[in-house]
UniProtKB/Swiss-Prot annotation:
The porphobilinogen subunits are added to the dipyrromethane group. Tetrapolymerization of the monopyrrole PBG into the hydroxymethylbilane pre-uroporphyrinogen in several discrete steps. Keywords: Porphyrin biosynthesis, Transferase. Binds 1 dipyrromethane group covalently. GO terms for biological process: protoporphyrinogen IX biosynthetic process. PROSITE patterns: PORPHOBILINOGEN_DEAM. The keyword Transferase applies. It is an enzyme of class 2 (transferase). It catalyses: 4 porphobilinogen + H2O = hydroxymethylbilane + 4 NH4(+). One of its GO terms (molecular function) is hydroxymethylbilane synthase activity. It comes from Clostridium perfringens (strain 13 / Type A). This is Porphobilinogen deaminase. Its cofactor is dipyrromethane. Pfam families: Porphobil_deam, Porphobil_deamC.
Length: 291
């Protein structure tokens, strides 16, 4: 038996899927292969995500492959997965979470704090751009899209002083050496689910249990809390929304940020990790009290 796993065509997506394939072989002794899918988000690199529909752009075609029984499961970056899945699907496993931090990449090793006044920083993320302005309101934000390698090339092609990328992607690609600095995730809040992988299947799929065996309870606890926070705020690519969460013993600590009436609001919450979804909801409600 050989399971078929659908994923995007990018090098990072393939590396992430290969990690899941290794886990399947190691834990379940199951062979698998990739089905590469071109998504709308990959095709439309000339337009900012917030202008063409946001997160679902990276999953719809992959879900279609599942519906058509072309694949048994799909691997996503959790930060790309909308907070509401179509009723036919479920997230059966969240097997691992890499470094959740954002990373600063510059050609000469400069950090954000020692850049020249008016430095040009590449990012198309509203979350990153708005938080950057809190650190340095003199910076010029330049929209860039593309895969990791393409964005790094744009530092020279577009005369940028640096770009911001997810540390997880760089580490998974073996490119940690290009990182000039890391952002403190409790200050510069990551995207919802950043660094985490998710495995999506059709509900009731014959082979779902193989994927479910890869689930990490701690990763699911944190990511579900963050997605609960996002669901209440209806956040996506159109607004600043970020969260940091961590499990310590039986506790879950979480920080969230969101734009309310053109003002960036940040709150935190602490509670029992078993109440993770409720805690995410309560944190969002604390922020909305600022309206």
């Amino acid at each position: 038996m050989e399971l078929i796993i659908a994923t995007r065509k990018s090098k990072l997506a393939q590396v992430q899927t290969e990690k899941v394939m290794e886990l399947l072989k190691g834990k379940e002794n199951v062979d698998s292969k990739k089905l590469l899918v071109m998504t709308e988000g990959d095709r439309r690199l000339d337009v900012s995500l917030n202008k063409i529909g946001g997160k679902g752009l990276f999953v719809k075609e992959i879900e279609l492959a599942l519906l058509n029984k072309e694949a048994h499961g799909a691997v996503h970056s959790m930060k790309d997965v909308p907070f509401e899945l179509p009723s036919e699907f479920e997230l059966v496993a969240m097997p691992e979470r890499e470094d959740i931090r954002d990373a600063f990449v510059s050609l000469n090793g400069s950090t954000l704090s020692n850049l020249r006044k008016g430095a040009r920083i590449g990012t198309s993320s509203i979350r990153r751009a708005e938080q950057l302005k809190l650190f340095r309101d003199d910076l010029e934000i330049v929209p860039i899209r593309g895969n990791v390698q393409t964005r790094i090339k744009k530092i020279t092609e577009e005369n940028l002083d640096g770009i911001i990328l997810a540390a997880a992607g760089l580490k998974r690609l073996g490119m940690e050496d290009v990182i000039s600095d890391y952002f403190d995730p409790k200050v510069f809040l990551p995207a919802i689910g950043q660094g985490a992988l998710g495995i999506e299947c059709l509900k009731g799929g014959e082979f779902n249990d193989y994927f479910k065996a890869l689930d990490s309870k701690e990763v699911r606890t944190t990511v579900e809390a963050e997605r609960s926070f996002m669901k209440v705020l209806n956040g996506g690519c159109h607004s600043l929304i970020g969260a940091y969460s961590e499990v310590k013993d039986n506790d879950l600590y979480m920080i969230g940020t969101f734009t309310v009436n053109n003002r960036i609001v940040k709150k935190d919450i602490l509670g029992n990790k078993e109440d993770n979804i409720l805690l995410g909801k309560k944190l969002a409600e604390k922020i909305l009290e600022e309206v």
